[in-house]
């Protein structure tokens, strides 16, 4: 029984805050100063898929219809902490626009931040955003980019420029 509990603890990811913008903590960790919830999700490291990239995946969630699960109608999915692939080149596909909560162009803003173009960042509305605004974009990002970190770097770059 104790061994099963230890395995259960190891197979879970503990997040201080919400799933999209929280920080990973240890099972004995604490909530962050600005967090009001503890989220626990499956780690997913116990799942091994042979040729997972080529399978049709009828039971996997996909925001951009990469898998055939969207043909099966609405259903609940069990999501885990796996990234399922590495970082890729940024593709301008409009996927951020579908989920971004504000009326700005998030893909162009991210490109301006990566390029370090402060004038373009200001023109595209960097003063109106926070890293947490890009949490859902990061979730649906087919390029697997850490968009919240990129936005934080851009805001820090602006702060350094103003000082």
Regions found by a protein language model. Give the residues of each.
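Gly/Ser/Thr/Ala-enriched C-terminal appendages of enzymes
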Residues: 22-163
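Single conserved hydrophobic/aromatic residue that forms the stacking wall/gate
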Residues: 1-9
């Amino acid at each position: 029984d104790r061994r099963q509990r230890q395995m259960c603890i190891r197979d879970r990811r503990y997040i201080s805050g919400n799933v999209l913008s929280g920080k990973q903590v240890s099972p004995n960790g604490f909530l962050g100063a600005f967090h009001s919830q503890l989220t626990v999700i499956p780690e997913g490291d116990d799942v091994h898929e042979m040729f997972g990239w080529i399978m049709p995946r009828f039971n996997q969630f996909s925001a951009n219809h990469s898998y055939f699960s969207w043909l099966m109608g609405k259903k609940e999915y069990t999501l885990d902490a796996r990234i399922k692939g590495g970082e890729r080149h940024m593709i301008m596909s409009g996927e951020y626009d579908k989920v971004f909560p504000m009326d700005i162009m998030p893909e162009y803003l991210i490109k301006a931040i990566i390029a370090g173009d402060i004038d373009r960042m200001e023109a595209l509305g960097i003063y109106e955003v926070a890293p947490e605004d890009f949490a859902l974009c990061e979730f649906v990002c087919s390029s697997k980019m850490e968009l919240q970190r990129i936005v934080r770097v851009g805001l820090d770059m602006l702060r350094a420029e103003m000082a």
